[in-house]
Amino acid sequence: MKLKLILAVAMLAFSLPSQAERIKDIANVQGVRNNQLIGYGLVVGLPGTGEKTRYTEQTFTTMLKNFGINLPDNFRPKIKNVAVVAVHADMPAFIKPGQELDVTVSSLGEAKSLRGGTLLQTFLKGVDGNVYAIAQGSLVVSGFSADGLDGSKVIQNTPTVGRIPNGAIVERSVATPFSTGDYLTFNLRRSDFSTAQRMADAINDLLGPDMARPLDATSVQVSAPRDVSQRVSFLATLENIEVEPADESAKVIVNSRTGTIVVGQNVKLLPAAVTHGGLTVTIAEATQVSQPNALANGQTTVTSNSTINASESNRRMFMFNPGTTLDELVRAVNLVGAAPSDVLAILEALKVAGALHGELIII
């Protein structure tokens, strides 16, 4: 069986020159980022698909107390239309109080489905413990589940997770370092010394010498005006400057679970000879029942018959010549009929032998 490689190769794989990209496409402004919010709440109005756990009852009782309704200590409410949930959202930079956020609601307990439910007012907090938004509204759930009387069950997608578009109102904004200090710092999404230097050079070519300087393989510091309005137009100019990213380092990335192999253009192989054989062992179990005659005083016995077969496939040896490229590597492994798991073993062996020039990453 020939190997079918799923090769996700970047533009470099076809030996094309690197294309210039805008700074906004390859870097972020330091401090300008999303902030994660999370809360704990109740979803009500479920059509019998909620939960009856102790902490659900406790949360429900606490909510009633907040409304001035006190239940007896020994009273356990029988609720099947309520579920405790985790609510989370991402709060973008510069968002202001009164604006809205999309929220995701996920069941924390044994609720069968959140379909048809409504989230009650839930405080969304940041990592500092402060409340930044309040969420409430009807859930949109794409999944569903149905149970039959005979115990059969049908589940489509994930019925215990839903979303509320514009379901949270921002109550507090988050300060960013954008409007303070004498500098703006860009952080590359993919660290590379050459790209950082090229970015600084491109900015200096437009704004003048010594306006930008690379701090390391990730960060480029740029002198910026103090006035906020000038800083906005200044950044609008910077983020549209085009930079030609440096070539990626030679890498081979293998997903051992799916068999996906990603090979960069710069991967080279030194001379090496490879052969890979496979031993297959098959064990088949057959069960036989020996039933005695009805008039005989015997017992029913169950016996097992095992059949074991072993076979070893023959593989041809192939050789990598100096400077073997990606295309030649793919053709070679296809020629010997290697499976994805075999390719992983071959690549690991080549790396250990020093014949693979590139970083081997297994995910």
UniProtKB/Swiss-Prot annotation:
Listed NCBIfam families: PRK05303.1
Alphabetized Pfam families for the sequence: FlgI (PF02119)
Cell location: Periplasm; Bacterial flagellum basal body
Transmembrane regions: none
UniProt main location, coarse: periplasm
GO molecular function terms attached to this record: structural molecule activity
InterPro entries: Flag_FlgI
Family in the record: Belongs to the FlgI family.
UniProt source species: Shewanella sp. (strain MR-7)
A Gene Ontology term for the protein's cellular component: bacterial-type flagellum basal body, distal rod, P ring
Superkingdom field: Bacteria
Function, as annotated: Assembles around the rod to form the L-ring and probably protects the motor/basal body from shearing forces during rotation.
Entry keywords, A to Z: Bacterial flagellum, Periplasm, Signal
Lineage per the UniProt record: Bacteria, Pseudomonadati, Pseudomonadota, Gammaproteobacteria, Alteromonadales
Protein name from the UniProt record: Flagellar P-ring protein
Signal peptide per UniProt: 1-20
Subunit field text: The basal body constitutes a major portion of the flagellar organelle and consists of four rings (L,P,S, and M) mounted on a central rod.
Disulfide bond in keyword set: no
GO biological process, one term: bacterial-type flagellum-dependent cell motility
